Structures are given as C-alpha cells and as structure tokens.
C-alpha cells in the first residue's frame, strides 16, 4: 500500500519533534491512505505487473488505471490462454486522450483498437494481457 503522507510528513505538519508516537502516527497515516483508496475505488500508488482483461467488444478495452505508455499488449487469437499476438503501439489508442486535467496527469483507462485491428472478444474470457505500470502516474 502507498502511504500518501509519511510519518515524517505528518510529524512536520503537526510540529511534532519527538519519536514517542511514531508507531501510532504511522498507523494513522496507513489507515488514512486505506480510507482514501476505498472511498475513491482505486489505488494511487503504482505497481508493475502483468494483468488480464476480457474485452466487452472488439473496439474498446476497459482496463485498470494504467500509469504510463510503456506497456506490452498481447492477445489470444482463439481464447486458449496462449497469448500469441503482440500488439504494437500503432494498433491501439490509449484513452482518455490528453490524460491531463486540472494540473494532474490522469491514468489511462481504455485502449481503443484502431485501423483494422479488433480486440478478440470471447464472451467474458480474458483474451488480452497487458504488462505495464498500474496505478496513478503521480500523487
């Protein structure tokens, strides 16, 4: 879990100079971070990992918060969990376009198949996997 304020940050904001309550301050910071994640329904930290997705249709793939553009996208042509097709960046468009609002970088949440490409749609089966950095680009 990402702490949105370190123990040192909290102590500085409250002008606390001793370390008597560091464990309690850290616990409070951790609880506050968990509450923020739960309330917002997303995690603002980042993790680099491989994730699997089931397209709803051939044109648009909804994904978790994608923190950057350095990704590897692969798909399975026959729904057999063998990801035998590697997509190039020219094959899809990350959305929302211009993922920047109110002075903040926003994560990408969709990949649109472009040109003649279509996402392999197999009635709820995970036919796409993406290796990338997930979460919020910056907090």
What are these regions (language model features)?
Residues 1-139:
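Divalent metal-cofactor coordination and adjacent catalytic microenvironments
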């Amino acid at each position: 879990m990402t702490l949105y304020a370190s123990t040192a940050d909290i102590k500085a904001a409250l002008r606390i100079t001793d370390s008597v309550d560091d464990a309690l301050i850290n616990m409070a910071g951790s609880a506050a971070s968990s509450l923020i994640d739960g309330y917002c329904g997303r995690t603002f930290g980042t993790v680099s990992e491989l994730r699997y997705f089931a397209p709803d249709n051939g044109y648009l793939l909804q994904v978790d918060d994608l923190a950057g553009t350095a990704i590897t996208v692969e798909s399975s042509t026959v729904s057999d969990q063998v990801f035998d097709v590697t997509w190039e960046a020219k094959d899809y468009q990350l959305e929302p376009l211009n993922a920047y609002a109110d002075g903040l970088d926003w994560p990408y949440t969709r990949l649109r198949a472009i040109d003649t490409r279509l996402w392999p749609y197999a009635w709820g089966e995970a036919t796409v996997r993406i290796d990338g950095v997930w979460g919020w680009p910056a907090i």
